[in-house]
């Protein structure tokens, strides 16, 4: 009822309002009508939405003299607070974020408040990110004779009057708590937020000398803080994960080779088992270097195993044949004779059945020969031994640095053909690995494995210090540097060290003055893509301001005629 009286009072003619010094009240009524007009504009897409800053300023600038009593003042404050914080849409955490953001902006120097108003951050984290970007941009531009760093920030802080601060907090608390107590509506996702702090002056022109001079006085090159780079961290994690996967694969392959015995076993059953193990090792090596031949190798191995099983059965039925075979294998005749076995085999050659032609010799030198299980191929550089010459050839590429496989599109070279095949998918856009949950496709199977952990929530890598779990081993490695204090990434220019490579990349842009992210509207460049995204809001507000007051009045009249 008090609100109705207030609105009747605000409907006075301009002359009567001037006599009672109520010009502000008439202005508030016009704004209320405008808000009512915006509230009915939920079905039209060409009209910009109302700016939450209008509601925040009304709440902050509301005066007791504009009301006819304390009850009406409290009711009006609740209404304005409800319009600003929008508890029917925002959650408690989001409302708290709005209040903290406003207070954070209010304690900054006015020059920084003006600079931040241009971007209108939605959260305290965005505001901090913008300030850190400004620090990176202006760290090399030091103004002599000025006070720098935290001391300058402390001087720029203008605290609120105690009475004003206390009353403002109480009204905020009472308004929000009252709404949550009596409201039964379930909070929805945040759709819009209140943006800058109270009593922020109008922003100057972009890049004004006054703005740049004050900003450069606040930061120095020695106060370079590490900044999060979300858009670069993803590619970095995938890159490191791929390298670790390759190292783990090579280590596993070497361990398998070492586990197989170097002596050639005697006896039919032991020989069969050793040949099976050696064939598995060969199949693993082939699949690591030539992924496309895995199916063929497994098929050949299965045929060999079936034939060897049949041979073992025949030997058990014929003990004399088995004895003759053992004597032949253990005798010195192999080193003296070399004969080729092809096609039809005699009884002495049964048990050799690989279905291929090969030569019996004391020294095996070709990949097509029967594996012996010995590591006869030794690297002259590091002394590492291999069972096959092809594995030694691939290993020597590590020492020589040879990259014979070159991409025809971009000229990038690789040491293995399988790596070239994976690289060419970047140019062709091929993504053969698809997620069964959401249908998203990837060019590498390793990327699909990482993606599937989003659906499963799997985090197999746990920190021993604090128990925090991660889905990737690279994330765990980065996290553990917080406990150890390790900073392996050092700047070659100034010697400053960082615990993440992404931080070092961002830091180097201070020396190179690189700004790779450029706005297509005005041509302004930035060091990070996230800052460019915030910059786009300036152009969005410019498009919204193109609506003239005359068009808004005509739209309001149209809405009234529809009622």
Swiss-Prot record:
Compositionally biased tracts (Basic and acidic residues): 270-289, 297-352
Keyword entries, A-Z: DNA-binding, Isopeptide bond, Metal-binding, Nucleus, Phosphoprotein, Repeat, Transcription, Transcription regulation, Ubl conjugation, Zinc, Zinc-finger
Residue segments, region Disordered: 1-51, 257-373
Keyword Manganese attributed: no
Subcellular location, record wording: Nucleus
Modified residues annotated as Phosphoserine in this record: 13, 208
C2H2-type zinc finger span: 377-399, 405-427, 433-455, 461-483, 489-511, 517-539
Covalent cross-link site, Glycyl lysine isopeptide (Lys-Gly) (interchain with G-Cter in SUMO2): 27, 181, 228, 280, 299, 304, 339, 375, 412, 440, 478, 560
Residues covered by the KRAB domain: 227-300
Main location: nucleus
GO MF term list: DNA-binding transcription factor activity, RNA polymerase II-specific; RNA polymerase II cis-regulatory region sequence-specific DNA binding; zinc ion binding
GO CC terms: nucleus
Domain named SCAN box: residues: 56-138
Keyword Ribonucleoprotein appears in the UniProt entry: no
Listed GO biological process terms: regulation of transcription by RNA polymerase II
Role according to the record: May be involved in transcriptional regulation.
Recorded family membership: Belongs to the krueppel C2H2-type zinc-finger protein family.
PANTHER family referenced in this protein's UniProt entry, alphabetically: ZINC FINGER AND SCAN DOMAIN-CONTAINING, ZINC FINGER PROTEIN WITH KRAB AND SCAN DOMAINS 1
Name of the protein this chain belongs to: Zinc finger protein with KRAB and SCAN domains 1
Species for this entry: Homo sapiens
Gene name as annotated: ZKSCAN1
